[in-house]
């Protein structure tokens, strides 16, 4: 069976790097990279498609390419990378919702990876210094990027309930500006 991976956010460093590495993997037949602007860096081996994940047209990209794995890297930690807080929220939350809707309708998607963040744990003075995956923050994030990723995770959990046939992964890396 052919393996076709769609990676969002390929114009930024981490998304582009991942797409390039996946394209070099012999178990992956094709990598489709999606973003609103063409990458300034090399993504050789990746088929670039200019598309906005906030638009329902992303479903056409997934279906026409026969994508079986979606890796959503287009979650922006810093408002300046998005043009301000409002566009950041739209890209992060609305974009993820549209992408999940497209994956839900898809007949080919079998795996979904959505980049989350350790920011979802919060960082109040009452929180412990170290968290485990099983722990919950004392207070849910109330604003900014941390709230975005908490909302995103909630939508992804809902997707996983509706599509139990799709394997879902939510990695929570520690954020660094260089990884946007």
Predicted regions and their residues:
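N-terminal Rossmann NAD(P)H-binding glycine-rich loop of SDR-like oxidoreductase domains
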Residues: 2-27
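SDR active-site strand-loop-helix element
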Residues: 8, 34, 70-76, 112-118, ...
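Conserved glycine-rich Rossmann-like NAD(P)H-binding loop of the short-chain dehydrogenase/reductase
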Residues: 27-36
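Rossmann-fold cofactor-recognition segment
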Residues: 43-55
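NAD(P)H-binding glycine-rich loop region in Rossmannoid oxidoreductase-like domains
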Residues: 53-94, 105, 123
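Active-site Tyr-X1-5-Lys
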Residues: 141-171
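Glycine/proline-rich active-site loop of Rossmann-fold NAD(P)-dependent oxidoreductases
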Residues: 164, 178-180
């Amino acid at each position: 069976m052919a393996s076709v991976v769609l990676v969002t956010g390929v114009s930024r460093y981490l998304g582009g790097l991942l797409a390039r590495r996946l394209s070099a993997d012999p178990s992956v037949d094709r990598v489709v990279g999606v973003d609103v602007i063409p990458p300034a860096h090399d993504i050789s081996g990746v088929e670039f498609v200019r598309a906005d994940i906030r638009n329902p047209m992303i479903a056409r990209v997934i279906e026409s390419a026969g994508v079986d794995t979606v890796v959503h890297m287009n979650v922006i930690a810093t408002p300046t990378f998005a043009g301000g807080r409002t566009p950041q929220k739209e890209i992060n939350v609305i974009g993820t919702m549209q992408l999940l809707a497209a994956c839900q309708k898809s007949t080919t998607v079998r795996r979904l990876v959505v980049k989350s963040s350790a920011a979802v744990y919060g960082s109040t003075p009452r929180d412990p210094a170290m968290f485990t995956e099983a722990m919950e923050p004392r207070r849910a994030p109330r604003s900014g990027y941390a709230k975005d990723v908490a909302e995103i995770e909630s939508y992804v959990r809902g997707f996983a309930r509706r599509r139990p046939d799709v394997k879902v992964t939510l990695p929570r890396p520690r954020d660094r500006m260089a990884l946007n």
